[in-house]
Amino acid sequence: MTPLKIAIAGANGRMGRVLVEAVNNHPDTVLSGALEHSGSEALGLDAGYAVGLKTGIAISDDVDAVLAQSDVLIDFTRPEPTLKHLQKCVEKQVNIIIGTTGFDDAGKAAIHTAAEQTGIVFAANFSVGVNLTFHILDTVARVLNEGYDIEIIEGHHRHKVDAPSGTALRMGEVIAGALGRDLKQCAVYGREGHTGPRDPSTIGFATVRAGDIVGDHTALFATDGERVEITHKAGSRMTFAAGAVRAAVWVNGKTGLYDMQDVLGLNNR
């Protein structure tokens, strides 16, 4: 079997470094390119330097050259560069795995349009455990239905720039969908001052940014006399990276827009 050629965007970032390692660890993939922004101090260095690997792949800012020798790009950067990379992937017929969060509606629309021409796995979280959590939350929300106050609490490291996290928002979307609600209409982001009694139709979000927290997420369902808490805690970024590589292998040869639920076969159940 010919190894799948995977390029990494943001290869010198916290997530990018782990992705390089994850590609190296997978028996059916090979690192074909590593991208960083122009002016990065990492340009020209071996992509594996930060994790003790010698990959033979130099970090580059030449998107066209990197994609020309790749089957798929994994991108966990920021919305603006991701959308630029997305357009290049469409032009080069390269699949793309998108773990970037914080897209506005226009950005999400661009991803949907691009999926008509290439294969895309776009997910708020690539952890197998988190995606099982989404599946569980759908069941819990349908069974508990009305009568429970719902709050989502998430925590990440001090460097994360968007809040709430994409995973927390996806948890909210799953729960709202199961209850027949529109998250945009029922979400409450933080509370301050004299807020009055809680509106039972809302889904609340609370955010923590501290230290080196990789990712903690809890969905709380509370009513008189009992609480149900569904929690996922990530201890290493490798859980996300390994899932992204798994998605890259899965989407090879496909066109269309998918998420991690598709990769795991959970949307077929």
UniProtKB/Swiss-Prot annotation:
The keyword Nucleus does not apply. The active site is at H156, K160. (S)-2,3,4,5-tetrahydrodipicolinate binds at H157, G166, T167. One of its GO terms (cellular component) is cytosol. It is found in: Cytoplasm. Signal peptide: none annotated. It catalyses: (S)-2,3,4,5-tetrahydrodipicolinate + NAD(+) + H2O = (2S,4S)-4-hydroxy-2,3,4,5-tetrahydrodipicolinate + NADH + H(+); (S)-2,3,4,5-tetrahydrodipicolinate + NADP(+) + H2O = (2S,4S)-4-hydroxy-2,3,4,5-tetrahydrodipicolinate + NADPH + H(+). One of its GO terms (biological process) is lysine biosynthetic process via diaminopimelate. It is an enzyme of class 1 (oxidoreductase). InterPro entries: DapB_C, DapB_N, DapB_N_CS, DHDPR_bac, NAD(P)-bd_dom_sf. Keywords: Amino-acid biosynthesis, Cytoplasm, Diaminopimelate biosynthesis, Lysine biosynthesis, NAD, NADP, Oxidoreductase. One of its GO terms (molecular function) is oxidoreductase activity, acting on CH or CH2 groups, NAD or NADP as acceptor. Pathway: Amino-acid biosynthesis; L-lysine biosynthesis via DAP pathway; (S)-tetrahydrodipicolinate from L-aspartate: step 4/4. The keyword Cytoplasm applies. NAD(+) binds at G10, A11, N12, G13, R14, M15, E36, G99, T100, T101, A123, A124, N125, F126. Catalyzes the conversion of 4-hydroxy-tetrahydrodipicolinate (HTPA) to tetrahydrodipicolinate. Belongs to the DapB family. This is 4-hydroxy-tetrahydrodipicolinate reductase. It comes from Neisseria meningitidis serogroup C (strain 053442).
